[in-house]
């Protein structure tokens, strides 16, 4: 028990001064460049759609002027339009919170760079757009044929703003950083504008998204600490989908209450979870935990997670947010894919002397399919086809030029092929391509006041084929199989790294 407590005891050497560099170092941007976190080398800090219209010199001067004028005492009843120093306080808050978010990201980015560079002899792919969605690729490529049950988990969202502040308490050395964080949360925003749970994943206010995402990711990082801790305690516990993205987090604060829930000897509890076939992945506000264990073992996992989150975060976590499903009898809509385990029957003829036997074998196979019905429903809602899948023209695009119309249809087609390139069966994608191609032809024919046959005969069918099949240079990943044949290479799954920016395909229900 003492060994476990020493393991969970926070390491004070990991703490950092976050606010002091922002206030007292005038050239804080030089600090970022010295650590290799500039725009060309950054892993976590770069966002392609991020509006980077502020400098840390301005942020530092804003803090100095606000302290001199004592503007932190402005009441929350004041309107955001009440200006001081020539600007409104919403602008001040946004600029300072963005600068604060950048500062606190620096040590975490350095830690990730260090963990990635620790793989000696391994070629680790480094991308500045690396996100949690990319951890689902190896998860879907894992062999699920031996697994029996899955836990569908909705990660509990913080019911109080103070929980978000406390998630950083082990990494912060200067208390002024926490005070500034509380000021941002309580002075300018409320919980409803920070995190909403109307969708499977959480949505954030459009203001200071970088700041909010950092807080939420820190909170989720703390929620997942239980899996990393158990993985380190058991050499058999696998976390194949995370690799260097996760590392140990310290949650000693309320672990004693958790121990009292189970038993006096915590090792007995740990023994229950030494599962050699455990697969875990998270994307947005959902988590999936797949195991070869029995229903009793999965029920113990459910009980453990509920009590851990309740004790550690002091929140009421309902057991209804965790569902136990049998993998062979349950299909799930995961990230826009329809994932299921199907049985492939095979018959083997065995002959012994004069007697022959027919042996029926059922082999489990994990499929990631394209959900054709929801996808056609989305196309019908966007007026590309009917609800039955019959292509129709797009009248609102008739005023565009021919090249713009073809480019828009081609972009949608390429995005769909990129997103669902990891599907085990791509026959559905060619049906979607047929719908978009014919819808494009009918839109062009409508614009030129002719029939589809006449338009294609005059322009040539190669025109649409060239635009709809043109590929862009996009980074992708493929996972090698044990057996590689020509047919296997043709049917291999390709995972593109840009799928997180393809519309909202990952969010539709």
Swiss-Prot record:
InterPro entries membership: Domain_X, Maturase_MatK, Maturase_MatK_N
UniProt keyword tRNA processing, yes or no: yes
Q: Does the keyword RNA-binding apply?
A: yes
Q: What GO terms fall under cellular component here?
A: chloroplast
Question: Please, one GO biological process term?
Answer: tRNA processing
Instruction: List localization entries.
Output: Plastid, Chloroplast
Report keywords, A-Z: Chloroplast, mRNA processing, Plastid, RNA-binding, tRNA processing
Question: What intrachain disulfides are recorded?
Answer: none
Which Pfam families does this chain map to?
A: Intron_maturas2 (PF01348), MatK_N (PF01824)
In its UniProt record, a GO molecular function of this protein is:
RNA binding
Query: What's this chain's function?
Result: Usually encoded in the trnK tRNA gene intron. Probably assists in splicing its own and other chloroplast group II introns.
Q: Which family does it belong to?
A: Belongs to the intron maturase 2 family. MatK subfamily.
Question: Mind telling me which HAMAP family this protein's record contains?
Answer: MatK
Protein name stated in the entry? Maturase K
Q: Which organism is it from?
A: Nicotiana benthamiana
The organism's lineage?
Answer: Eukaryota, Viridiplantae, Streptophyta, Embryophyta, Tracheophyta
